[in-house]
């Protein structure tokens, strides 16, 4: 293998051209390639380029404070956004609500599978997920505003069954986060909360003829990494950027915690209790519905506090709590560390976790919502103007 190019974040930003489709890694506030996104934002603010980008991501990225996806939230920088969760990037949400960008909200798990299908050069991702919801073309096809015209979702009939076809498209550049890279570009994610989508995103970009750029903590001798820990092989990687300590935080603004990577386990009673407020009361009532030995998914918002309640009550080991980022068992964290799990028994790829979810493997799920109607209809996709965000 040839040695990989090691460049600065500013040099990486120059590899992005006007009109490119760029995919970014990360899950909420965790594993965000901040050095790369900051450099690209600065280049645009200084020169007006690159412009008219298409931004493509699965989980929302950032902390509603100008980080993550908000680095792309400037008029003219992006022309289209295709995302699974917008809430963490309110600047992007504002552009969508103002009809200044084309905007799509597609199911998060479907996007994780789209990466795989783009890599495999499949015609698209065919699934039952999204039928009869806002992602169904009969109900808007995931379009969020009036200026969004192109249909990315098509209703198809296969063997007499309705399915949705989510159309794939090439990815020109992807920005990813790794932990260590060797001299040949092989990258681990052993200090991140999980592998997330890095393998699939890198494959999709490489097989689109695009450029894979990975931000890491450090570079080590070639061939010295445990091959079982390498999630981005060097054959996919075009360039490595070594980020600063601040830009390589495990989760934004949070120091490294080995309990979230499986490096060590912590006593459950060492996890600080959360304050008693309205959301904790909701979580305590919801926790009363936790079946013993059930496989559980906890969503963001009030549901994430159920994990804290279970830990406080000493019942975390009575069921298996999971989060879509990939954690199996343990205690899922909330807030800035949502997506991470302390004391996990396993940490899977994001798309693999969704394979299990979409096939009905869960016994129960506790999910957040914006509005509910008396008949049980739920709005989980658009909040009011006080939030100014699209989920």
Regions found by a protein language model. Name each.
Residues 1-391:
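Conserved alpha/beta enzyme-core scaffold
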């Amino acid at each position: 293998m040839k040695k990989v190019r090691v460049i600065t974040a500013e040099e990486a930003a120059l590899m992005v051209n006007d009109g490119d489709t760029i995919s970014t890694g990360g899950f909420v506030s965790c594993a965000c390639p901040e050095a790369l996104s900051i450099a690209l934002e600065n280049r645009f603010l200084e020169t007006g380029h690159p412009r008219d980008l298409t931004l493509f991501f699965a989980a929302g990225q950032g902390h509603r404070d100008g980080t993550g996806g908000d680095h792309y939230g400037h008029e003219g920088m992006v022309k289209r956004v295709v995302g699974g969760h917008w809430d963490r990037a309110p600047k992007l949400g504002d552009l969508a609500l103002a009809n200044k960008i084309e905007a799509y909200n597609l199911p998060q798990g479907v996007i994780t599978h789209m990466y795989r299908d783009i890599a495999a050069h499949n015609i698209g991702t065919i699934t039952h997920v999204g039928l009869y919801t806002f992602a169904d073309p009969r109900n808007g096809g995931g379009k969020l505003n009036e200026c969004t015209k192109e249909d990315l979702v098509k209703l198809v009939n296969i063997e007499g069954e309705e399915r949705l076809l989510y159309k794939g498209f090439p990815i020109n550049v992807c920005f990813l986060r790794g932990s260590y890279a060797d001299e040949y570009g092989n990258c681990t994610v052993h200090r991140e909360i999980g592998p997330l989508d890095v393998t699939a995103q890198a494959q999709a970009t490489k097989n689109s003829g695009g450029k894979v750029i990975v931000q890491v903590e450090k570079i080590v001798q070639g061939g010295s990494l445990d091959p079982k820990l390498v999630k981005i092989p060097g054959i996919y990687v075009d360039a490595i950027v070594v980020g600063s300590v601040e830009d390589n935080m495990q989760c934004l603004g949070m120091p490294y915690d080995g309990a979230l990577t499986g490096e060590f386990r912590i006593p459950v009673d060492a996890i600080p209790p959360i304050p008693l407020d309205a959301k904790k009361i909701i979580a305590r009532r919801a926790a009363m519905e936790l079946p013993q030995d059930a496989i559980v998914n906890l969503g963001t918002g009030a549901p994430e506090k159920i994990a804290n309640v279970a830990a406080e009550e000493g019942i975390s080991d009575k069921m298996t709590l999971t989060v879509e980022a990939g954690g199996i068992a343990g205690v899922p964290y909330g807030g800035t560390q949502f997506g991470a799990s302390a004391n996990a028994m396993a940490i899977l790829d994001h798309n693999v976790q969704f394979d299990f979810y979409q096939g009905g493997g869960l016994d129960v799920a506790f999910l957040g919502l914006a509005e509910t109607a008396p008949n049980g209809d739920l709005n989980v996709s658009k909040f009011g103007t006080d939030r100014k965000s699209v989920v």
